[in-house]
UniProtKB/Swiss-Prot annotation:
Organism: Bordetella petrii (strain ATCC BAA-461 / DSM 12804 / CCUG 43448)
Protein name stated in the entry: Chaperone protein HscA homolog
Family recorded in the similarity comment: Belongs to the heat shock protein 70 family.
PROSITE patterns the record matches: HSP70_1, HSP70_2, HSP70_3
GO function terms (MF aspect): ATP binding; ATP hydrolysis activity; ATP-dependent protein folding chaperone; unfolded protein binding
Superkingdom: Bacteria
Family matches, as InterPro entries: ATPase_NBD, Heat_shock_70_CS, HSP70_C_sf, HSP70_peptide-bd_sf, Hsp_70_fam, ISC_FeS_clus_asmbl_HscA
Keyword Chaperone: yes
GO biological process terms held by the UniProt record: iron-sulfur cluster assembly
UniProt lineage: Bacteria, Pseudomonadati, Pseudomonadota, Betaproteobacteria, Burkholderiales
């Protein structure tokens, strides 16, 4: 996402001290932390060289808390106190948590379910905070200093409660959240898709326990998630289970002990992972009773086992396309996320569905964290070599809209701190006006023609009223990403229309400097031009209102009065397009003076009509 370095014209950009910020993929199965080092995003590893941190936390009766691989190893022995896949419970209610089928004792609590453990009742926020704290400590150990903040990724379908729960967990872990970033958007950023002009992309995310598919539309630097889909009960674990069932069939009818089932499952996972690089893989294990599992699993056999599961993911992908109103041919690229996408059968099926080779250059386990790291580095204010943009939390150029006469009404002035929101009321220009065109512009000049056009949209459904009676509230809101949303709402009916745009898209430092310099150099001429346009608008409004008044109540004037008003009206109509502000002002003043008595008589007639047939006590 192109963001901008902002400085006053003529001011040299001051060198910035590098600030440490990280990207965190808080995953259902595994979590990672990444940072930009030597201009390249990379995943940070622990002291043992491991990048992936299993998202598992064990709460021991003696008060000890074990996190990661050691906790996961105790899951079978201590399932009630070893919390895995806690991400599923973030921001969820008791009923939603119980529906997951997880083996925990859930407790109802205001706002969010809690889990009963050997160390008492804990919320998913507290459990997630334990995982985030380990990642924060890892980052500070590797980078050698404190962090200024983190970008944390969340599924695109997370609602407000789930997103707030993620923020709360980060705060408990001592992390300053720079941004919550949608996981598919993070993956797209890692591949540099945000630098493309526009396009529509699919993100196919097959993790250990869940499958998500997202359709992203990139328009002028703005990523929009247009559709999501998936299956929260489908992931790499299900492929392992299919292999383990295949293996168990060779062991006879005798039931397997729980420990043996786990042993076979571990062997199945090893075989699946080996098949990502080989045409066949050994499937071997020794059971507690001495029986031996000794098979060779071929790629063809595995593909037959995997076919129903792969088909389920493709069905979800087709459904997401339908929801987005798109065809397969509309997709410009497919990003693969999640360790399970290493399977050749998955990559081939996805490529056949979308008719294009999926993007697989980056490690699918790491791609989301890498994209988050790039975003975090940008938000921290660090400049990569060769880049001319830097995020500063201010508006570089004023934002406003076009009013009558081609004038700019500034809503948010330049250098306003973001995020920011401003609202202003506008009204109609003509009687019975049922629609209003909203033209959003950017710049410091007084005339729309000298500013940068950002977007246009129409508000329809304004109830018929006399000119100036309708009240349309226009709200400009710029979020922390620099994304501008403009909403126009008619106050009496509630009808509204809106548009979103990235004001910084396609705007360089040089162009900002030029626009600011032009506004200074042309300040006097712009002021004169604005004054002329305002006089012309006033003239048009007066001419239209006088014509309407004459049509309705012209009988209130005698012949001489009508002749004078008509002459002044004709002069004002001729002057309304003149280039001399003084001449326009004089014509307006002359017409106003000629119609003062006429306006008073019209008011008297209106009052008499309103009071006709009413008693004095009714009026009081």
């Amino acid at each position: 996402m192109a963001l901008l370095q902002i400085s006053e014209p003529g001011e040299s950009p001051a060198p910035h001290q590098r600030k440490l910020a990280v990207g965190i993929d808080l995953g259902t199965t595994n979590s990672l932390v990444a940072a930009v080092r030597s201009s390249t995003p990379e995943v940070l590893r622990d002291a043992e060289g491991q990048a992936l941190l299993p998202s598992a936390v064990r709460y021991c009766a003696d008060g000890k808390v074990v996190i990661g691989r050691q906790a996961l190893a105790q899951q079978a022995a201590d399932p009630f106190n070893t919390v895995v896949s806690v991400k599923r419970f973030m921001g969820r209610s008791l009923d939603e948590a119980r529906a997951s089928g997880a083996p925990y004792e859930f407790v109802d609590a205001p706002g969010m379910v809690r889990l009963r453990t050997a160390q008492g009742e804990l919320s998913p926020v507290e459990v997630s905070a334990q995982i985030l704290a380990v990642l924060r400590q890892r980052a500070e150990d590797v980078l050698g200093d404190d962090l200024v903040g983190a970008v944390i990724t969340v599924p695109a379908y997370f609602d407000d409660a789930q997103r707030q729960a993620t923020r709360d967990a980060a705060r408990l872990a001592g992390l300053n959240v720079l941004r919550l970033l949608n996981e598919p958007t993070a993956a797209a950023i890692a591949y540099g898709l945000d630098q493309a002009a526009e396009g529509t992309y699919a993100v196919y995310d097959l993790g250990g326990g869940t499958f998500d598919v997202s359709i992203l539309r990139l328009t002028k630097g703005v990523f929009e998630v247009v559709a999501t889909g998936g299956d929260t009960a489908l992931g790499g674990d299900d492929f392992d289970w299919s292999i383990s069932e295949f293996a168990r069939a060779s062991l006879g009818d005798a039931p397997l002990a729980p420990a043996d089932r786990r042993t076979v499952l571990v062997a199945a996972r090893a075989a699946r992972e080996a098949l990502s690089q080989a045409s066949e893989a050994p499937l071997r294990a020794t059971l507690q009773d001495g029986r031996q599992l000794n098979l060779t699993l071929t790629q063809a056999q595995f593909e037959q086992l995997a076919e129903p599961l792969v088909r389920r993911t493709l069905d979800r992908a087709r459904s997401a396309l339908r929801d987005a109103g798109l065809a397969v041919g509309d997709i410009n690229g497919v990003v693969m996320v999640g360790g399970a996408t290493r399977m050749p059968v998955v990559r081939r099926a996805v490529g056949e569905l979308f008719g294009t080779e999926p993007l697989v250059d980056l490690d699918p386990d790491q791609v989301v964290a890498l994209g988050a790291a790039l975003q975090a580095n940008l938000l921290a204010g660090n400049r990569l070599p060769g880049e001319d943009w830097l995020l500063l939390d201010v508006i570089p150029l004023s934002l406003g809209l076009e009013t009558m006469g081609g004038l700019v009404e500034r809503i948010i002035p330049r250098n306003s701190t973001i995020p920011v929101a401003r609202a202003q009321e506008f009204t109609t220009f003509k009687d019975g006006q049922g629609a209003m065109s909203v033209h959003v512009v950017q710049g410091e000049r007084e005339l729309v023609s000298d500013c940068r056009s950002l977007a246009r949209f129409e508000l329809r459904g304004i109830p018929p009223m006399v000119a100036g009676a309708a009240r349309i509230r226009v709200t400009f809101q710029v979020d922390a990403d620099g994304l501008l949303s403009v909403t126009a709402r008619e106050q009496s009916t509630g009808v509204e229309a809106a548009v979103s745009v990235k004001p910084s898209y396609g705007l360089s430092d040089d162009e900002i400097t030029r626009m600011l310099a032009d506004s200074v150099a042309q300040a006097d001429s712009d002021a004169r031009a604005r004054m002329l346009r305002e006089q012309q608008v006033e003239a048009r409004q007066l001419v239209e209102s006088v014509r309407a008044a004459l049509a309705a109540d012209g009988d209130l004037l005698d012949a001489d009065e009508r002749r004078v008003v008509d002459e002044r009206l004709q002069a004002a109509a001729a002057a309304q397009d003149a280039d001399d502000a003084d001449a326009v002002r004089a014509a307006v003043q002359a017409l106003s003076a000629a119609t003062e008595d006429f306006a008073a008589r019209r008011m008297d007639r209106g009052i008499r009509a309103a009071l006709a047939g009413r008693k004095l006590d009714e009026i009081a």
